[in-house]
């Protein structure tokens, strides 16, 4: 069964809330809600001491296509799109694992 845009929107919103993403009041040009979550990590750096790093993911759905924006310490890493909300969550989990964080 092919999913409609409304079904993908509902599944996306449910998955975002389930995985700790929050709607902070921002919307896209087409009125979609932008969900965001930030991870913090403190690492010990030789000859420097503790250093805090952050990883932020902003996600929204545009006409049935989940769009993910990645930021590492405030620097934009890029934008990615996925065919379904479940694939987007799986990709976010893998991106975070490679960056040293956990979903």
Protein language model regions, located:
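Residue-level detector of alpha-helical secondary structure
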Residues: 13-17, 89, 93-96
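Generic detector of low-complexity/intrinsically disordered segments
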Residues: 17-18, 26, 53, 72, ...
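Intrinsically disordered, low-complexity regulatory segments enriched in Ser/Thr/Pro
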Residues: 44-90
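Hydrophobic alpha-helical elements and their junctions with loops/disorder across both membrane
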Residues: 66, 95-98
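Short acidic DE-rich linear segments
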Residues: 100-103
